[in-house]
Amino acid sequence: TVLRSLKGNIKLNGKIRFGMISIGVNNIFNSHNSYKSIIDIDGDLIFNGKVDFNTGIVLKIFKTGAIEFDGRNSIGRFSQIISKKNIHFGYCCRCSWNLYISDTDFHFVKFKNIIHNNVKPISIGNNCWIANNVSISKGVTIPNNTIVASNSYVNKTFEQEYTLLAGIPAKIKINDVARVFDVEEEAYWNKYYGWM
């Protein structure tokens, strides 16, 4: 892990315990930790609970930016999270590999002689599952209990919970759906279907 800058603030809220923040976590999809992560904090990085970062991640927080994790979060390998304003991950929000999320476009664009703000906050709700190769752009709100399918681009706010978002750009594809996060329930279904 490369600590490029720690000029900002790292805030640990709640009960602090060993393993609360893990960087370079190995799992079945990432069996070695030779990929370096880059941590560049000039703004605020806020932890309200446990967060696991796989290898090869980039966290870039500009002086005016903030990234906040509510706990039971995981960020998959090769993910990039970049903030100039505010990015908030709700409780038990899990993200697979190659996530790209940025609350800025970095460059200004003139459209019909008007230059709009290129920075807007992002909020991801509780109990969300963001699959691999997903991009989330500025100004997006993803509600609680949402699944975002692989290879999707989320560029607008959604309000309805218990949906599957998919596509470029992402649209609601299925209603009344949610990922199972409970370990015991998942073990039951693995056994039920003969996977254990």
Where are these regions (language model features)?
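Domain-scale signature associated with acetyltransferase and cell-envelope carbohydrate enzymes
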Residues: T1-S102, G125-N127, V134, N144, ...
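A generic "structured core" feature
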Residues: G125, I142-P143, I147-A149, Y153
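Glycine-rich NAD(P)-binding loop of Rossmann-like domains
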Residues: I114-G125
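Short-chain dehydrogenase/reductase
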Residues: W129, I147-V148, L164-A166
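Gly/Pro- and small hydrophobic-enriched strand-loop and loop-to-helix capping segments
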Residues: N155-G167
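Extended serine/threonine-enriched, polar tracts that run as long, contiguous segments within proteins
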Residues: I130, S137-G139
